[in-house]
Design a protein with these regions (language model features):
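A short, N-terminal "cap"/entry segment at the start of jelly-roll beta-barrel domains
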Residues: 1-30, 71-73, 81, 117-135
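Short histidine-centered beta-strand/loop micro-motifs
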Residues: 43-48, 66, 73, 92-95
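Short acidic-glycine-tyrosine-enriched beta hairpin
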Residues: 24-28, 36-37, 61, 66-86
Length: 135
């Protein structure tokens, strides 16, 4: 039986198309599932210095905030991304107090560079003008 290419194309649903600012040569790629319990504040403010990250919400709702962007809710079946480099990721909190949050994230990183670096309070204060005020 011959495979019908149209069947393959009908099976694919594109949820996100991004042109990342950079992908390091000799990049390493890590795909992880992160699980936050109901009401969790998620990871502290951090960055991905070695490259961009791409994610997809599997369960629950994420309160997502990047430096320079207003916070937004990402729901099941929706995708998100971070440019990496110097941009601070302020929130990946569970937006719900009644159900857990599970999301998949694929991080691209230059060899020898940490996948994630927590941002300290002094730097957060120095860069507070880059954060979009919550409404």
């Amino acid at each position: 039986m011959m495979f019908d290419t149209a069947d393959l194309m009908n099976a694919i649903t594109t949820i996100q198309t991004i042109t990342p600012p950079f992908i390091p040569s000799d990049a390493e790629v890590m795909t992880s599932i992160i699980e936050w319990p109901a009401g969790s504040a998620g990871a502290p403010p951090h960055r991905h210095p070695g490259g961009p990250s791409f994610g997809y919400v599997l369960e629950g709702e994420m309160l997502f905030e990047l430096e320079g962007e207003a916070p937004r809710v990402i729901k099941v079946g929706e995708a998100f991304w971070e440019p990496g480099g110097d941009v601070i990721h302020y929130s990946d909190a569970n937006n719900r107090s009644d159900i857990p949050l599970r999301f998949l994230v694929t991080m691209i990183c230059a060899p020898g560079v940490p996948m994630l670096v927590v941002v300290d309070e002094d730097e957060l204060e120095q860069r507070r003008d880059r954060r979009v005020p919550r409404q």
